[in-house]
From Swiss-Prot:
It comes from Wolbachia pipientis wMel. The lineage of its organism: Bacteria, Pseudomonadati, Pseudomonadota, Alphaproteobacteria, Rickettsiales. It is found in: Cytoplasm. Specifically dimethylates two adjacent adenosines (A1518 and A1519) in the loop of a conserved hairpin near the 3'-end of 16S rRNA in the 30S particle. May play a critical role in biogenesis of 30S subunits. Its EC number is 2.1.1.182. S-adenosyl-L-methionine binds at N31, I33, G58, E80, D106, N125. It catalyses: adenosine(1518)/adenosine(1519) in 16S rRNA + 4 S-adenosyl-L-methionine = N(6)-dimethyladenosine(1518)/N(6)-dimethyladenosine(1519) in 16S rRNA + 4 S-adenosyl-L-homocysteine + 4 H(+). SUPFAM superfamilies: S-adenosyl-L-methionine-dependent methyltransferases. This is Ribosomal RNA small subunit methyltransferase A. Keywords: Cytoplasm, Methyltransferase, RNA-binding, rRNA processing, S-adenosyl-L-methionine, Transferase. One of its GO terms (molecular function) is RNA binding. Belongs to the class I-like SAM-binding methyltransferase superfamily. rRNA adenine N(6)-methyltransferase family. RsmA subfamily.
Length: 286
């Protein structure tokens, strides 16, 4: 065991955390990583960091932060909402002056482009209570990022990476995979965290595409997938009635029978449907 591993074992030990550190705040979705092997695996998935600025969300006591800094990024910016935890980063700030900074802020309300320069990689153990909202926020400006290596609740990771004809496939799957190449890398058991959550976690890698996989008006697509997945057990000819009075025409032009359910459609088929709805709205079909 080298010195760094020894320090990690002492600092991020469940018993020591219970005795000496602040009680995690459930309201902030705090679950701290206990395993140095896991932090190593997460950071390794992000690839070389030497020429990249890195953003970390919810650094907690700095387990993942320390591993990121070992890989010598151009700079590291951590965003932490908990003021009490920000104070625990004084030593890291002193050790990595000019390279590391931490901001007390709500990650949902920051504008990354104003805080850090490209190229940017995100590496984060996301707070459970904001993970989906934060990921959707990033999808809205996805081209700003080179890559994202993210830990989610397993159920959220399953929704993001789900394929057609599965129970987890939905709006989050369609939108994410339209804009990015996404891969689920590995699952993590509750015992690897303090406090121990009741659910498993998963790490995914997200690589933004230069352009979406298919040409589509994103606003129309989002309205479409929200409408049809809100009634996911209904056939398309019925669920489409919520967004157009010409469902049969839209289905015919998209070469669909209307008997399909939302979970049966590929991303390409959703984009084709959305484009036909858009044409109707613009009166281009007649």
């Amino acid at each position: 065991m080298n010195f760094r591993q020894l320090i990690f074992k002492i600092l991020y030990n469940e018993n020591n955390m219970k005795k000496f550190l602040l009680k995690p705040k459930k309201s902030l979705g705090q679950n701290f990583i206990l395993s140095s092997e896991i932090t190593k695996k997460i950071v390794a998935l992000a690839g070389s960091l030497e020429n990249f600025n890195v953003i970390e969300i919810g650094p907690g006591y700095g387990a993942l932060t320390r591993e990121i800094l070992v890989h010598n990024p151009k700079s590291l910016l951590s965003i932490e909402k908990d003021r009490d935890l920000v104070k625990h980063h004084d030593q890291l700030l002193n050790e990595h002056q000019g390279k590391y900074r931490i901001i007390e802020a709500d990650a949902l309300h920051i504008i990354e482009e104003e805080l850090i320069e490209r190229p940017v990689k995100v590496i984060a153990n996301l707070p459970y209570n904001i993970s989906v909202a934060l990921f959707l926020k990033w999808l809205d400006s996805i081209k700003f990022f080179t890559s994202l290596t993210l830990m989610f609740q397993k159920e959220v990771a399953d929704r993001i990476t789900a394929r057609p004809n599965s129970k987890d496939y939905g709006p989050l799957s369609v939108l994410s995979q339209l804009l990015c190449d996404i891969k689920k890398e590995f699952d993590i058991e509750p015992k690897e965290f303090f406090p121990r959550p009741k659910i498993h976690s998963s790490v995914i890698t997200v690589n933004p595409l230069p352009t979406p996989k298919f040409v589509v008006n994103l606003e129309t697509l989002i309205k479409l997938i929200r409408a049809v997945f809100a009634q996911r057990r209904k056939m398309l000819r019925n669920s489409l009635q919520n967004i157009t009075n010409h469902a049969e025409t839209v289905l015919e032009n998209a070469k669909l029978s209307g008997n399909e359910r939302p979970e049966n459609l590929t991303i390409e088929q959703f984009c084709l449907l959305a484009n036909n709805v858009e044409c109707l709205l613009c009166n281009k079909m007649y």
